[in-house]
Every structure is written in C-alpha cells, then in structure tokens.
Regions:
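Catalytic alpha/beta active-site cores
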Residues: 1-237
C-alpha cells in the first residue's frame, strides 16, 4: 500500500484533492457535496445486480442466491405488463409476461417475490415508473405484515415518469396526473419512510432512444427541474 499522505493526493490534472470542500461540507445541508460526511470512505455504494426472472418464485430464488454471494442490496426488474399496469392474464399481456423481468400482478406475487428476505436489512431498488405507487404499496403491505416499521425500509423507487414520455413509452396517464402520483410518493415517504429514495432520475434511456450526449444531459436536468418544481408546489399547499 502507498504511504502517500492522502491530504496531498492530486488528480491526473494536477489538481490537489481535499478531504472536504468549502463551507458546504458533505453530510450537511444543502448536501450539494454529498449526503454523508465522508461519503464512500465510510459507506460504500450498494452492490446489487438488476434481476427479474419469468416468475416471482424463480426471481426469489435468484435474489437469495445473490445475497449468499455477498450483494448488499437487490434490484428488481419488472416485465412490461407490470410496468404498464396490466395483469399477466390480460389479453394485451400475451407474449410479454416474464420476458424482460418478473411479472407482479397481485400482493400475493409480491409476497412470493420477497419471501424470507429481511426487508429491514436488505436495500431494495425497484425500477418502476408509471405503476410505481402500486409496487411501493405492495412493499409497504409486506412490511406491515411482518411488523417492520416503515422507517426501517431502505431502497429506491425509480418513479421517473417524464423520461417515459421522452424515451421508453411505458406511461399510462397524461403528464399532469402522472406528476401528481410522483409527488404523492414524495409526500408519503417524507412522512413515513425517511430512509427511502423516492426518485431515481435517469438519462441512460434517453440516450439509448437516440439523443446526443448533450441532449441526454439537457433532458435529464430539465426533468429534474420539473420534479423539483412539482415537489415545491406540492409541499407549499
């Protein structure tokens, strides 16, 4: 290991790195330098693999396997019918059930999916948008059934509906009511699930849909600004 003084480390551009930067230190409001005092030096990133198999049972088996291998969190991939609000037995779901992720139509499916997984110990990420409020509700019910306080749940729900209009197309409702659902999640979690990340704003899908790097950044930040404004309006009411 190097004996170099960490306070004298420089970047490849010969810029000296500090432990902390300016008056807005990491872990302090407004958190522009990070949400933890020492960031990854004390708290490593959550290690998780995006996964969702053709059934809740098979997906559950995979999650237990991943946890045995040492992942520190789970990342749930849902199939297209689940993403767009269709039950697996709906005629429009024919041919798509379980293709790109796990099908979840009912609370019973969710019970099977997360069977014997300690929800108060394992961070869970759910990549879901237009039906985010439904899947989050399922998770809340499971926690309540297992007598787990909601403020003990840790994880993230993508809840990034605007990029669905721009890139993926898995929206259900017009933008205005969809944004209300987004901010309803903000409101509920801020009051009941303090350790839950209520949105994950994504640019990757926009780039994959044909945007340039500049357009990807522009759309992503404009979405973030729109969510921020919607949240301010919500909490000002």
């Amino acid at each position: 290991m190097s004996n170099e003084n960490p306070n004298k480390i420089k970047t490849t551009s010969n810029i000296k790195l500090k432990s902390y930067y300016g008056k807005n230190n990491p872990g302090e409001y407004p958190f522009t330098s990070g949400i933890y005092p020492r960031m990854y030096q004390d708290k490593l990133w959550t290690m998780r693999q995006y996964a969702g198999f053709s059934s809740a049972k098979k997906s559950n088996e995979r999650y237990h396997y991943l946890l045995r291998q040492g992942v520190s969190g789970l990342s749930i991939a849902f199939d297209l019918p689940t993403q767009t609000g269709y039950d697996s037995d709906h005629e429009i779901s024919d041919g798509e059930v379980g293709k790109v992720g796990v099908p979840i139509s009912t609370i019973e499916d969710m019970r099977t999916l997360l069977d014997n997984i300690p929800l108060d110990q394992v961070s869970i990420s759910m990549t879901i948008n237009s039906t985010a409020i439904v899947l989050l509700s399922f998770l809340i019910v499971l926690a309540q059934e297992n007598k787990i306080p909601l403020d003990k749940l840790k994880g993230t729900i993508q809840n990034d509906i605007l990029k669905e209009y721009i890139a993926r197309g898995t929206y259900i409702y017009p933008p205005k009511p969809s944004m209300k659902l987004v901010t309803d999640i903000f409101e509920y979690c801020s009051q009941n699930m303090k350790n839950w990340n209520t949105i994950s704003i994504s640019g990757y899908h926009i780039r994959e849909a044909g945007a340039t790097a500049v357009e990807e950044l522009a759309f992503t930040f404009s979405n973030a600004i729109a969510y921020t404004k919607a949240a301010i309006e919500k909490f000002a009411q």
